[in-house]
Amino acid sequence: MNIPEDLRYTKDHEWVKLLDDGSTALAGITDFAQSELGDIVFVELKAPGTKLKAHEVFGTVEAVKTVADLFAPIAGELVGINEALDAAEVVNTDPYGEGWLVKIKVDDAKAVEELLDAASYRQLIGA
């Protein structure tokens, strides 16, 4: 199970990476989440400009097995979505790279640091 050390994680199996500008973050689903979902066939996300509250639903992932809600890992404004998601299988093949989901202008960068670190996330999923 791939759990990069430089990311932060939620109990809902999303990851967050604060970008170098310190106010924007990328977010996606974890390797664990994509493996549990199975083959992802479609991703639906709210539009850029949407204000997000932490833990609020911001989209859905449709897999062969199921449809799952996506929860905002942090509060902020959704400022971008990954255009590569037209080929939704990229979430399965590269969940931490090309398969990122959204870019968020964060309300509070410190909130990212309050999320789970890699060791805590490993413990959560029993890895």
UniProtKB/Swiss-Prot annotation:
GO terms for cellular component: cytoplasm; glycine cleavage complex. Its cofactor is (R)-lipoate. Binds 1 lipoyl cofactor covalently. The modification N6-lipoyllysine is found at K65. Belongs to the GcvH family. PANTHER family: GLYCINE CLEAVAGE SYSTEM H PROTEIN, GLYCINE CLEAVAGE SYSTEM H PROTEIN-RELATED. Keywords: Lipoyl. The glycine cleavage system is composed of four proteins: P, T, L and H. One of its GO terms (biological process) is glycine decarboxylation via glycine cleavage system. Gene3D superfamilies: 2.40.50.100. NCBIfam families: gcvH, PRK01202.1. InterPro entries: 2-oxoA_DH_lipoyl-BS (IPR003016), Biotin_lipoyl (IPR000089), GCV_H (IPR002930), GCV_H/Fam206 (IPR033753), GCV_H_sub (IPR017453), Single_hybrid_motif (IPR011053). Pfam families: GCV_H. This is Glycine cleavage system H protein. Residues 24-105 form the Lipoyl-binding domain. The glycine cleavage system catalyzes the degradation of glycine. The H protein shuttles the methylamine group of glycine from the P protein to the T protein. CDD domains: GCS_H.
